[in-house]
Amino acid sequence: MALGLQRARSTTELRKEKSRDAARSRRSQETEVLYQLAHTLPFARGVSAHLDKASIMRLTISYLRMHRLCAAGEWNQVGAGGEPLDACYLKALEGFVMVLTAEGDMAYLSENVSKHLGLSQLELIGHSIFDFIHPCDQEELQDALTPQQTLSRRKVEAPTERCFSLRMKSTLTSRGRTLNLKAATWKVLNCSGHMRAYKPPAQTSPAGSPDSEPPLQCLVLICEAIPHPGSLEPPLGRGAFLSRHSLDMKFTYCDDRIAEVAGYSPDDLIGCSAYEYIHALDSDAVSKSIHTLLSKGQAVTGQYRFLARSGGYLWTQTQATVVSGGRGPQSESIVCVHFLISQVEETGVVLSLEQTEQHSRRPIQRGAPSQKDTPNPGDSLDTPGPRILAFLHPPSLSEAALAADPRRFCSPDLRRLLGPILDGASVAATPSTPLATRHPQSPLSADLPDELPVGTENVHRLFTSGKDTEAVETDLDIAQDADALDLEMLAPYISMDDDFQLNASEQLPRAYHRPLGAVPRPRARSFHGLSPPALEPSLLPRWGSDPRLSCSSPSRGDPSASSPMAGARKRTLAQSSEDEDEGVELLGVRPPKRSPSPEHENFLLFPLSLSFLLTGGPAPGSLQDPSTPLLNLNEPLGLGPSLLSPYSDEDTTQPGGPFQPRAGSAQAD
């Protein structure tokens, strides 16, 4: 028995020993084959000697993919003189080249990837890119790898261009050190390239029939890292300038170079939005870049048109970075580096109100007008653009003098519009006070149309009181009759005297009839007896700009009057004259004292809104050629004529290419 057990054990041990020897031999053979395969790869011998088996297999698969890709028709057509330039390509590029398969595997990366990410070429080739990008960017990359399908039935090629931003892992620090992959940070890369489909060369099967393979889908990208503004050297050159914005893209700082390249002074841009100086056709693309900036921290815009001060535009590209100066979102700001691609083009084309001096939305300079800019008596005002309906109130003239000849203080468009009204009122108006010795700053000659323009009846209805004051009071009293109202169902009364949204067109009285025996309710006047303060000539208020000057605002009643609404009006009637004076002081301009003469009411204007002041189109009674183009650009006129070029008499020029400025129009103001 013992001898049998010993023989069985010896046989088992011999088998195990033979199995271990066979496994050791197979592993040695595999290692030898893998190292031979590693030396076959196009790497330096010192690099391939330190590769493990998994890396050798990964790099071999990637090499076979690139070999098939390079054997395709388009890749195989390489000029004889192209090889010496391969080393210069990487030096000229500010990024690295990356080739992705349809599954997202990195088939190839250029050698200079380590300068931008800190990871070597061998560490990335063959891996899936989804393991190295931010989780929030994986869906965007998957959409870029998917071929876009066209919905048209015609055979139209799908767009192959791709441009997006990715956040990849980077082991580089700001001081140039390399960290571990577990401590890597995110770095924003601007990726641009094309989706390619290459047909491999046809191969013949053993049966003799050609074996066709599906085309190879790959995404060829150039990835450029966006530099941080703090790493830029101070001299940016004449073709670039720096600016800082708030999170809503309003200028908080701008470099002085903006005056040389675009004609703006830094003070003109402070507080203005950057969107106001971008061409309307490029605003959508810039808005997408700003959205990427706020979500990823850095972004690079495409080539867009930045509007110049005196007309025209400059082709520009911007690198933007969100910089945090402390804790909280309020301490964040956006620093932009603008690179100019061209000089000023199309200098005669005005594309925005910011490019005109008279329609500029920047704050007015508070100071005395210079002797050169002060108009002289007899000068005319030429406004070829949007109509300007303005009525100035010189402080040196009395109310009676203004009422006697109001057309002297109207713009030409306003005189044409109010011509029939002013003619009819000037016959009845008699000045009670002689004219002051001081003449107005801009007297204008009257130019009235012979016929009644269209819409004058509506203007007469808005600008004049068609009924007497007593008739208006009668209608309001009837509307508030106690027999027709249920006081328990009424909301508390709130005074609307200070509501700036009310105007004369919304306060027209309704057609009620006053019953017999009704007692009229006493009314307070719309104008209170306050003398106007002395104002500077540059700060003349516009008539109708103060809602308290509206002749149609509801007036307060007398607390002693017997009114059915006395219980609901206690809070309004309890206001003192001191509160009213405080409201006037908050406005900054005290309304002038109104003359008790009823014949002056024909010259009071209702509150003009901004849309009414900037109404586009020709003035009533004027002729305009409908074939005269506003702009010589192939773009929709959705912005309206009031926001486009107001110069219809100048010869427009055809816009040049974005990178070929014409001679004569390439000088910046």
From Swiss-Prot:
Q: Name one GO cellular component term.
A: nucleoplasm
Signal peptide extent: none
**CDD domains to which the protein is assigned, alphabetical:** bHLH-PAS_HIF3a_PASD7 (cd19729), PAS (cd00130)
Annotated PAS domain ranges read: 82-154, 227-297
- Main localization, broad class: nucleus
Q: Which Pfam families would you find in this protein's record?
A: bHLH_HIF1A (PF23171), HIF-1 (PF11413), PAS (PF00989), PAS_11 (PF14598)
Q: What is the effect of changing residue 570 to R?
A: No loss of ubiquitination. Reduced ubiquitination
- Region labeled NTAD — which residues? 454-506
Find motif (LAPYISMD) and give its ranges.
490-497
Q: Which SUPFAM superfamilies match?
A: HLH, helix-loop-helix DNA-binding domain, PYP-like sensor domain (PAS domain)
PTMs per UniProt: In normoxia, hydroxylated on Pro-492 in the oxygen-dependent degradation domain (ODD) by prolyl hydroxylase(s) (PHD). The hydroxylated proline promotes interaction with VHL, initiating rapid ubiquitination and subsequent proteasomal degradation.
Please indicate if the UniProt record lists Transcription as a keyword.
yes
Region ranges (ODD): 452-581
Per UniProt, what is one GO molecular function of this protein?
protein dimerization activity
Where it sits in the cell: the answer is: Nucleus; Cytoplasm; Nucleus speckle; Mitochondrion
- Read off the InterPro entries from this record: bHLH_dom, HIF_alpha-like, HLH_DNA-bd_sf, PAC, PAS, PAS-like_dom_sf, PAS_fold
Biased segments, Low complexity type: 530-541, 550-564, 629-646
State the residue spans of region: Disordered: 1-27, 354-389, 430-451, 523-600, 619-669
Residues annotated as region Nuclear localization signal? 77-100
Q: Which UniProt keywords apply?
A: Angiogenesis, Apoptosis, Cytoplasm, Developmental protein, Hydroxylation, Isopeptide bond, Mitochondrion, Nucleus, Repeat, Repressor, Stress response, Transcription, Transcription regulation, Tumor suppressor, Ubl conjugation
**What happens on changing residue 467 to R?**
No loss of ubiquitination. Reduced ubiquitination
Q: Which residues form the bHLH domain?
A: 14-67
Polar residues: which segments have biased composition?
A: 430-444
**Quaternary structure, from the entry:** Isoform 2 interacts (via ODD domain) with VHL (via beta domain). Isoform 4 interacts with HIF1A; the interaction inhibits the binding of HIF1A to hypoxia-responsive element (HRE) and HIF1A/ARNT-dependent transcriptional activation. Isoform 4 interacts with ARNT; the interaction occurs in a HIF1A- and DNA-binding-independent manner and does not induce HIF1A/ARNT-dependent transcriptional activation. Isoform 4 interacts with EPAS1. Interacts with BAD, BCL2L2 and MCL1.
Q: What is this protein called?
A: Hypoxia-inducible factor 3-alpha
